[in-house]
Amino acid sequence: MSSGVQGGPAANANAYQTHPLRDAASALGTLSPQAYVDVVSAAQRNFLERMSQLASEQCDAQPAAHDARLDDRPALRAPQERDAPPLGASDTGSRASGAAKLTELLGVLMSVISASSLDELKQRSDIWNQMSKAAQDNLSRLSDAFQRATDEAKAAADAAEQAAAAAKQAGADAKAADAAVDAAQKRYDDAVKQGLPDDRLQSLKAALEQARQQAGDAHGRADALQADATKKLDAASALATQARACEQQVDDAVNQATQQYGASASLRTPQSPRLSGAAELTAVLGKLQELISSGNVKELESKQKLFTEMQAKREAELQKKSDEYQAQVKKAEEMQKTMGCIGKIVGWVITAVSFAAAAFTGGASLALAAVGLALAVGDEISRATTGVSFMDKLMQPVMDAILKPLMEMISSLITKALVACGVDQQKAELAGAILGAVVTGVALVAAAFVGASAVKAVASKVIDAMAGQLTKLMDSAIGKMLVQLIEKFSEKSGLQALGSRTATAMTRMRRAIGVEAKEDGMLLANRFEKAGTVMNVGNQVSQAAGGIVVGVERAKAMGLLADVKEAMYDIKLLGDLLKQAVDAFAEHNRVLAQLMQQMSDAGEMQTSTGKLILRNARAV
């Protein structure tokens, strides 16, 4: 009891709690299968070595009084009779014999273990040699097949080359035969023209037929040889393809053998330690995350490249459409300016014609010319000050009531005729509008020269409409301002004096050219008036045609502007798609990171639980 008290807790401890292999045994549950096998094998070797060592000590030295055991535990002996000799008094021979037997047993055991290891190594070596021989035989077989295919392909290529040479020679012979036929035909034709005797013609004809027969035979041989050459060439191509396939098989077999029997062969290297289930699953998920992340990165890069290329193309198209739009707008502006200049020039020419007519009609025509000049000057002043042309407003009822319906009717008829002939609807309408304006102008000019009553009626309508519009214009604020401007302009520029001087000059010019009679003056005045009417109508027609052309150019410009806006929308859409791709990439990575974090937390929790269980088990 005293010894137990003095020893403290160590004296009362269980023998298994103080055993030196306790920690190693506790660690067995956390080892991998391969590490477990290594630990058990090492323990067996240490046990056998210890047994051999103790047996040798007992054989060489005197036995101890306490008869020590191999596991350092006290030996238990059966009770003996008092008359029996003590166990220590037994002769040494028996002990030595027992130790020798134990040593012999251990030697046999080690030899068996070594023999089993050697047998296993031999079996693996045999397997390795067999596999190597099989791979070598396979490579030899594939190499022989490749060599045969190469030889056959080479022979077929040589045969095809020879056949091609023969076909070429046959073709040359056929050409020579054709030349002979042409020569025979020429000799026969010359003989016919020269009127040679019939027997001579018959011989030449027979020679011609023979040449034709030989040429036909030569062409037949050439075609046959060419077909044979083509066939052999196809066969050579097929054999070459087969040889390439054999070469690919040899390369694949060599690569497979290199991978299987190289430095990383599983039969020559020990197996890597296997992971536990959770660790292996975590490793697999990590690899999966790596693959998915790599795929997402590649997908994002491909989408970014695609969207960038599409944006660049759309920007180039947008720039092109913008340049075309600017060109169309500029063209329309230039056309409008050109037609405006033409209209102004024609207007001033008409004014000049009116002044010329004044020389032959006297004061009335001169007054009308002065009014025309005043209206022209007033129109320019009004356009410069207010930006509005009252002459355009005066001519608008004429265009709406007379010229425009006539132009629309003619244009409709021309359009229907063009559509019936198969012309496109849009092109037919454009051509009809232009031709309608031209035909209307020509008709009015012709009618003006003829002086028909219908034109007089139209002219009366035009005069009534213009008179009404002129009355309204004069009553309006613009008309009053125009009258004031004209009066001021007359006072400042001396238009009245200019009018009187012009009348005197016109009278002198009328007398100078010999127009004394009133009828002659009226005739010339009528002619000048017709010329002015024709030019005025031509001016209106040209202005209408110019307006149509300007409208067409503006329509094209509007179409280009629509294309520009569509391209801008496409660029914005591509930017939105690229942004969505980036957001999807970030979302995928976030989900994968969250999944791996959850797996890591689960593994950490499992490890902590295992450690806690082992710690509690050790305390038992």
Swiss-Prot record:
One of its GO terms (cellular component) is host cell membrane. The keyword Ribonucleoprotein does not apply. Residues 58-95 are annotated as: Disordered. Belongs to the SctE/SipB/YopB family. It comes from Burkholderia pseudomallei (strain K96243). It is found in: Secreted; Host membrane. Keywords: Coiled coil, Host membrane, Membrane, Secreted, Transmembrane, Transmembrane helix, Virulence. This is Translocator protein BipB. Its main location: secreted. The gene is bipB. Human meliodoisis patients have detectable antibody response to BipB. However, BipB does not act as a protective antigen. It comes from the Bacteria. Residues 66-84 have a biased composition (Basic and acidic residues). Residues 309-339 form a coiled coil. The keyword Transmembrane helix applies. The chain crosses the membrane at residues 355-375, 401-421, 430-450. It holds the Pfam family T3SSipB.
